[in-house]
C-alpha cells in the first residue's frame, strides 16, 4: 500500500544520506511540540475531541512517519486485551492474568526481534513502544482493580499510593485508547498512570492553581485556559535534548564500540586506559537516553501533563510529574542506589508498585518472592538478549556490595551524631563518585553489546576486575572473618565509639543504682525497636541480599499452602465460571448495541462502566 509520507521521507534519506531511524524518531519526538500547542487549546469540555486528536496523531506517527502497520497491530492487541479483560472479567486474578498476557506478548516480540526480524534501514522496531505500553496497561489493571473491584473495607486497607491511583469506573474506549496511544510518549515514554491522564484530560489536576496563573483566552475575552503557560521551560527541554543528541552522535563517532571488540588493538593498551575507555562508552551511551527522555518530558510539560502542583510559598509551578531522568544526580551520585533511583524513574515506580509490592503476601513484608519476581520482570522487560542478563546479574551483586561498603565506610566520615559530615567526607564522596562511574562503565558493556561472547570478551580484556572486587568483598564481609572485619570498621566510626562509651557509662550507673538501671534498660530496649528499618525495594536492580534469601523456603511453603487452600475451595471451577460470565457479559453488551440505536453503540464506547465489588464466591 502506497504511503506518501514514507515516500517523501525515503527520498530525503536517500538524497541526503540521513539515518532512517534517527530522522523518523526525531520527527515524532519534535513534531509533538506543535501538536501539543494545538491540543492544549482545545476547549476543556471537549474531551471526545481531545481523545480523537490524540489517537489521530498517533496513527499518523505509526502509519505515516514510521510505516509500522504491524507495529500498530501489536500495540492494539495488548491494549484491547487489557480493556476487555478489565471490563468484563470480575476476579481477583484479573490483574495477574493481564500481567501475564501483556508481558508474554512483549516477550514474543522480543524473541521475534532477536531471532526472526531482519532489521533494515527502512524498518523501526516497535518493541520499545510496547515496553512503555506494557507499563501503562499492567498498572491500569491494578488501579482499576483497586478502585472498582474491591469492597469498601478492602479499599481502606490499600496504601495511600494505591488509593491515589485507584480508578473508580471503567473508562470509555475512546479515552482508554487515547491513554494507551498518547503520541507524546508513544515511542520513548515516559509511562504514567491512568489516574494522572484522566485528571489532566478533565483539567482536574489544575484545580489548585490560582486563577491569576491561568492565561487568558485570546478569542474569548474574560475566560481563562486551565493549563498555565510553560513554553519557555518546554523549549529549554528541547534545547537540552538536542544538545544530548549532538553529543551522542559525536561521541559515538570518536569513541566507537567496535574498538573494544578489536582483539589486536584494545588489549594492547594499558589497563588504566581500558577501564576508562569503558567508562567513556557507558557515559556516551547514556546521552541518547538523556536526549529522548528530556525531549519527551518537554512535550508532556507543554501539553500540561507534566504539571505537579503549585507551591504557594515560592509561588512556583512544579513540572516534574512525568520526569524520567535526573541527569545531574545520575552523574554525581555517591552510591549505587542514589544513581538507580534517578535513572528511568517511572520504570522504577512501575516495578515497585506493580510488581514488588503486588506479589507480597498481605500482612507480610516483601522478601525473597518480591525480590525474585522484580529482578526477573526488570530483566525480561528489557528483552531476551544475553547482555541484559549479564548486566542485571552483575548489577545486583554490585549493588549489594555497594551497600556493604556504604554501611561500613560511610560512618567513618561522619561525626558522633551520624549525620554531620567530617571535612574528610568530601574525599569519600569524590572517591565514591569515581568508583561508581568506573564500575558502571564496566557493568553496562553487555547492555550495549547485547551478545554473550563479545560481552565476555570485553570484560575479559580488563580481567573481570569488578567481578573480582565484588567476590573479594563478599569473602571479606560475608566469609569466615566477617565478624572481625566488621568489628574493625566499627571501631573507626565516631558514632559507634560514642555509643559504646555511652553504653559503658549506663552499665556503670545501672550497677551502682538499681532503680535508675531499670529505666536505662527500658530505654535501650526501646532504641533497639526503633532501629529496625522498614523493608524497601531497591529501585532499578534488586540486590542479592544473601541473608534475606534464607526465607525462600518459607515463601515457597506459603505459596503451596495458598494454592492448596484455593484448590480445596474449588478455585479452578470458580475461575472457569468467572471467565464464562465474562464472555456472556461481553456478548450481551455487544448484542444490545448491535440490536439498538446508534446512541446505544455510542454509549457502549464512550460512557464509563463500573462493576460491583468482587464477591467472596467470585474470589
UniProtKB/Swiss-Prot annotation:
Optimum pH is 6.5-7.5. It catalyses: a 1-acyl-sn-glycero-3-phosphate + an acyl-CoA = a 1,2-diacyl-sn-glycero-3-phosphate + CoA; a 1-acyl-sn-glycero-3-phosphocholine + an acyl-CoA = a 1,2-diacyl-sn-glycero-3-phosphocholine + CoA; 1-acyl-sn-glycero-3-phospho-(1'-sn-glycerol) + an acyl-CoA = a 1,2-diacyl-sn-glycero-3-phospho-(1'-sn-glycerol) + CoA; a 1-acyl-sn-glycero-3-phospho-(1D-myo-inositol) + an acyl-CoA = a 1,2-diacyl-sn-glycero-3-phospho-(1D-myo-inositol) + CoA. The keyword Lipid biosynthesis applies. It is found in: Endoplasmic reticulum membrane. Residues 545-593 form a coiled coil. Pathway: Lipid metabolism; phospholipid metabolism. The chain crosses the membrane at residues 20-39, 52-72, 93-113, 232-252, 275-295, 430-450, 457-477. GO terms for molecular function: 1-acylglycerol-3-phosphate O-acyltransferase activity; 1-acylglycerophosphocholine O-acyltransferase activity; 1-acylglycerophosphoethanolamine O-acyltransferase activity; 1-acylglycerophosphoserine O-acyltransferase activity; lysophosphatidylethanolamine acyltransferase activity; O-acyltransferase activity. The modification Phosphoserine is found at residues 513, 605, 610, 615. One of its GO terms (cellular component) is mitochondria-associated endoplasmic reticulum membrane contact site. Its EC number is 2.3.1.23, 2.3.1.51, 2.3.1.n6, 2.3.1.n7. Residues 1-19, 73-92, 253-274, 451-456 are lumenal. It holds the Pfam family MBOAT. Residues 40-51, 114-231, 296-429, 478-619 are cytoplasmic. Residues 592-619 are annotated as: Disordered. GO terms for biological process: glycerophospholipid biosynthetic process; lipid modification; phosphatidylcholine acyl-chain remodeling; phosphatidylcholine biosynthesis from sn-glycero-3-phosphocholine; phosphatidylethanolamine biosynthetic process. InterPro entries: LPLAT_7/PORCN-like, MBOAT_fam. It is an enzyme of class 2 (transferase). The active site is at 146 (nucleophile), 297 (nucleophile), 382. It comes from the Eukaryota. Its main location: endoplasmic reticulum. Broad specificity membrane-bound O-acyltransferase that mediates the incorporation of unsaturated acyl chains into the sn-2 position of various lysophospholipids. Preferentially acylates lysophosphocholine (LPC), but also lysophosphoethanolamine (LPE), lysophosphatidylglycerol (LPG), lysophosphatidic acid (LPA), lysophosphoethanolamine (LPE), lysophosphoinositol (LPI), and lysophosphoserine (LPS). Prefers an acyl residue to an alkyl residue at the sn-1 position of lysophospholipid acceptors. This is Lysophospholipid acyltransferase.
